[in-house]
C-alpha cells in the first residue's frame, strides 16, 4: 500500500514539473521572438563611408620619371624617326621618308608589376602607335601572305608591302614583340590590348574584360561599356592621359580616367611576366606621335 502511494505521488510530481516546463516555454518563446523582432527592426549603427578621392594624374608621389623631357638618355631608337621636341619624345613619318613600324625602347630595365602613365598625342590621319610593355626585343618575323591574298593585291599594295619589309629589316634592331596598349588617330583601336608580333593579335577589344587560358578560346568575362561610348572620352589630335597597370596576370588600360580594356592572361604560351617598355610608330602618310610626362611606379 505504501509503494502504491509513493508511485501516485511520483506521478503527481512529474505531472507538475511537466506543466511548469510547458508554461515556462510558452512564456519564453514569445519573449524571445519579441526580442528578435526588436533586434531585426533596430537600425544598425551607420558605418562610416568616405568616397575615394579621384586620382590626380599629375600626382607623382612614389613614381619615377623615366623621360627627362630634354634628352633621349635611357631610350634607344633610330634617330631617323625619333627626337625630343617641346618636352616630348616625338616620332615622325612622312610620305618621302616613311618610318615603317618601329619603336623607341626604354633601356632602364624590364619591369614586372608596375603602373606606367604617359600623355600621348597623335597627328595625321594615318597615325598609329601604342605603348609596348612586358615586351621582347626580337628579330622581325617574316611576313607570309597566302597566294590567294597576294593575287588580289594591287601593284600599289605590293609595293607598300615590299617597302614595309625593307624598313623592318632596316630598323630590325628596335623590333618589339609583346603586349601593346593601342592608340590610333581615328580611335578605331585606341584602348584595346593588342599583342604585337604574335598570332594572337587583338586580345581584348575596347570595352572588354577578357580571360585567356591554355588551349581554350578567349572568354569575355564582362563588358566595361560600349566601344563607341568609351571612344567619346578620347580626344583626337589632343593630349590624352594613358595609364597601363600590369599586376600579375591582370593588365589594365586606362585613358583619361576611363577603363578601356582588361586582360587576365593565364595562357603560359603567350603570357609575359616582365619585359621592355617601348613606344611604337607606324602608319601611312605624314604623321607625328608625341609622348610626354612618362612616369613609372613599380609594384610588389
Features from the language model and the residues they span:
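Hydrophobic single-pass membrane-insertion segments
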Residues: 27-35
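Short, hydrophobic alpha-helical membrane anchors of single-pass surface/secreted proteins
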Residues: 11-14
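Carbohydrate-interacting regions of secretory-pathway proteins
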Residues: 34-300
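N-terminal secretory signal peptides that target proteins for export/translocation
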Residues: 1-9
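Bacterial N-terminal signal peptides
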Residues: 16-28
